[in-house]
């Protein structure tokens, strides 16, 4: 199956407020629909502030990726100023596996 990268560039300069407002809904969606995600994370600027998203998908077509993205809360709530999906060929993989905490098991303090 082909690999695709979704790249979403946030609206500068104050996207963090919107990201924070939608983050719980975003994480819930990703956790419920993550079977095709191979890697994901936030892009950060030179100051360490989140400024976008990159998600690597293992899906049959670019149309399937866009269908997933269009239902994703950051996309639906307008976090991104610009988005793209590109087919990607993995040539080297040295990522260390990191688990993403399930927000349903986190306590708020």
Where does each model-flagged region fall?
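Conserved, structured core segments of small domains
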Residues: 1-109
């Amino acid at each position: 199956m082909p690999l695709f990268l979704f790249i979403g560039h946030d609206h500068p300069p104050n996207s963090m407020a919107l990201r924070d407002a939608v983050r719980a809904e975003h994480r819930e969606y990703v956790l419920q629909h993550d079977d095709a995600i191979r890697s994901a994370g936030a892009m950060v600027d030179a100051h360490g502030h989140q400024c976008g998203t990159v998600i690597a998908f293992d899906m049959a077509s670019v149309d399937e990726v866009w269908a997933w993205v269009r239902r994703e809360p950051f996309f639906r709530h307008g976090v991104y100023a610009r988005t793209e999906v590109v087919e990607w060929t993995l040539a080297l993989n040295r990522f260390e596996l990191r688990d993403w905490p399930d927000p349903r098991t986190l306590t708020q303090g």
